[in-house]
Amino acid sequence: MTEIGLVSCTKKKREESSSPAELYMESPYFRKMREFCEANHDLWYILSAKYGVLEPYGEPIESYNETLRDSTVEEKREWAKSVFEQLQAKDSLEKDITLFIHAGKDYYGELLPLLEQTDTEVRIPTEGLGLGEKMAWYNDRI
């Protein structure tokens, strides 16, 4: 069984071009999710509002100011469809894989129905928690 963590991007970013894993390190929340994923999952990817699925140590990208928070439902559906296709291309939606979503509902709300149509198991360990509660959840497990 392979475990893959999916970590949402964050508003706080470095200003200079960086690898995706480093770009979001300005955010304490991202740092906690990253640390948890690196310690507990076999692989992890970043869910970017602008780029979709990013390899953490892939090519450097420029800082950007884009989020799904204010996106329409249709925009979120289009984004989710693109992310789903990217995950398929990475063979990340197979029967022997469990996806752990470390993101808010803006990032998984429209993606979850697509994932539920596959044989992949999906877990959202911090579902229903507020930001402070999520930080405490990660602190307790790192």
Regions found by a protein language model. Give the residues of each.
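Peripheral peptide segments
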Residues: 1-142
